[in-house]
Swiss-Prot record:
PANTHER family, sorted: GLUTAMYL-TRNA(GLN) AMIDOTRANSFERASE SUBUNIT A, TRANSAMIDASE
Name of protein: Glutamyl-tRNA(Gln) amidotransferase subunit A
NCBIfam families to which the protein is assigned, alphabetical: gatA
Source species: Cellvibrio japonicus (strain Ueda107) (Pseudomonas fluorescens subsp. cellulosa)
Alphabetized UniProt keyword annotations: ATP-binding, Ligase, Nucleotide-binding, Protein biosynthesis
Residues the record marks as active site: K76 (charge relay system), S151 (charge relay system), S175 (acyl-ester intermediate)
Lineage of producing organism: Bacteria, Pseudomonadati, Pseudomonadota, Gammaproteobacteria, Cellvibrionales
UniProt keyword Ribosomal protein, yes or no: no
InterPro entries membership: Amidase (IPR000120), Amidase_CS (IPR020556), Amidase_dom (IPR023631), AS_sf (IPR036928), GatA (IPR004412)
A GO cellular component entry from the record: glutamyl-tRNA(Gln) amidotransferase complex
Family to which the UniProt record says this protein belongs: Belongs to the amidase family. GatA subfamily.
SUPFAM superfamilies (UniProt xref): Amidase signature (AS) enzymes
């Protein structure tokens, strides 16, 4: 049963081949038996899941349901879930019980989707390896000596190990697409503003976006149908009709113009990864797409600009965790300043502290113009590069990550080396564009991701391009060795 995709689960539930309760119990049993190996979940909501599954079965019996009714998924532990711990993988929020649901959680609840639990992640979504979690690192099901990517590593590992058929995730600089690449999954980050951020604990508010990790593009389309919505509670959410993302999945790719940026194939890209991406380009040519060389000349500035803007926003957002209102509070503070200092020192991990310090420095008097203001100007130039490119092409294609999954500890002592893992994904966030990663082969028995970037609100086109690639290949059907 755990081999089924979301689309197959939907069909089976409609045909009464199995019940939501049976599927949910099956996944809960697998999590209990296998997740000690992967550490993909922080909280398993067994009782809640079975209650939701029973309610979904009643709705299914009545026949008046949404497409996803009865399907179980996992939620990244960055999304607030009423009555359930929402920790952001931090000691700071270890005991925080959210009083309300994030909008996307509420959307899925209304659709009858079952919550299996909350998945592990890098602390406050800051990381590319899922090594910064207060609850311990997550292991990649393809090779347990290697990282699953981050920050949505728990969501990726859970889906790759078949401990959930799909999971919600978030992406600030690549945190959906990079784990998708390293774990052999489909991961989509929608256009900024397409999906509500209300109830998603903020890292960098102008970059954060909720999205999906699944096995196939078809599954991602089904899940995005219910995830995307206009939400007046999120002032950055755009009031725009949500299309049926499954409607054009089978549309032929004849006439699709795919741009390949020369800047994505330079120094630092694993040659074997490059070869697989080039092979994927040939697949697209065989499907009727035309390939065009494009230039994104400010690509080399994306990482430095991001690591000024994101820490600056994180410094502001995380200032709310002060030991007064909620979150970790130190014992016996001498005065208010001691309360602030010790609560934050004890509650935040090393990487979070590093980014807060960098961000505070960039925003400080005398440095704002030299760093933050300049980074925002670079951001505008990066966005303009994409705008110019999309005058000539429909989709931009390249590698998702410069190399396959790396071993634990191999980059932890060099923050810059870790930051460069997101070199191909960050620009998409800076521009606010939709991005998607799909598997395109294996290097040294580890998955490699192919990234597709679309114009604003072109999620349907990206999903169509991804689905057609998956109809022509079987990379998305490959399972990590040893998975039961």
């Amino acid at each position: 049963m755990h081999q089924f995709t979301i689309a197959e689960l939907v069909k089976g539930l409609r045909n009464k081949d199995f019940s939501s309760t049976e599927i949910t119990q099956h996944y809960l049993d697998r999590i209990a038996r296998l997740d000690n190996t992967y550490n993909s979940y922080i909280t398993v909501t067994g009782d809640v899941a079975l209650q939701q599954a029973a309610a979904a079965d009643k709705r299914l019996a009545a026949g008046n349901t949404s497409a996803l009714c009865g399907v179980p998924i996992a939620h990244k532990d960055i999304f607030c879930t009423a009555g359930v711990r929402t920790s952001c993988a931090s000691k700071m929020l270890d005991k925080f019980i959210a009083p309300y649901n994030a909008t996307i959680v509420e959307n899925y609840l209304k659709a009858g989707v079952v919550m299996l639990g909350k998945t592990n992640m890098d602390e406050f979504a800051m990381g590319s390896s899922n090594e910064t979690s207060w609850y311990g690192p997550v292991k990649n099901p393809w090779n347990t000596h290697c990282v699953p990517g981050g920050s949505s590593g728990g969501s990726a590992a859970a889906v790759a190990a078949h401990l959930a058929p799909a999971a919600t995730a978030s992406d600030t600089g690549g945190s959906i697409r990079q784990p998708a690449a390293l774990c052999g999954l489909t991961g989509i980050k929608p256009t900024y503003g397409r999906v509500s951020r209300w109830g998603m604990i903020a890292f960098a508010s102008s970059l954060d976006q909720a999205g999906i990790l699944s096995r196939t593009a078809e599954d991602a389309a089904l899940l995005l149908n219910d995830m995307a919505s206009y939400d007046p509670k999120d002032s950055t959410c755009i009031e725009r009709d949500v299309p049926d993302y499954t409607a054009d999945l089978n549309k032929p790719l004849n006439g699709l113009r795919i741009g390949v940026p020369k800047e994505y194939f330079g120094e630092g890209l694993n040659p074997k990864t490059a070869a697989l991406v080039e092979a994927a380009i040939k697949v697209y040519e065989s499907l009727g797409a035309s390939i065009h060389s494009v230039s994104l000349p400010h690509t080399h500035l994306a990482v430095p600009a991001y690591y000024v803007i994101a820490p600056a926003e994180c410094s502001a957002n995380l200032s709310r965790f002060d030991g007064v209102r909620y979150g970790h509070r130190c014992e016996d503070p001498k005065d208010l300043m001691d309360l602030y200092m010790r609560s934050r020192s004890e509650g935040f991990g090393a990487e979070v502290k590093r980014r807060i310090l960098v961000g505070t420095y960039a925003l400080s008097a005398g440095y704002y113009d030299a760093y933050y203001s300049k980074a925002q100007k670079v951001r505008r130039l990066i966005k303009q590069d994409f705008v110019d490119a999309f005058h000539h092409v429909d989709v931009i294609l390249g590698p998702t990550s410069p190399s396959p999954a790396f071993e634990f500890g191999s980059k932890g002592k060099d923050p810059v080396a870790m930051y460069l893992e997101d070199i191909y994904t960050i620009a998409t966030n800076l521009a606010g564009l939709p991005g998607l990663s799909i598997p395109c082969g294996l290097v040294d028995d580890k998955p490699v991701g192919l990234q597709l970037i679309g114009n604003f609100f072109a999620e349907a086109q990206l999903l169509n391009a991804a689905h057609q690639f998956q109809q022509a290949t079987d990379f998305h059907q490959q399972t990590a060795p040893g998975i039961e």
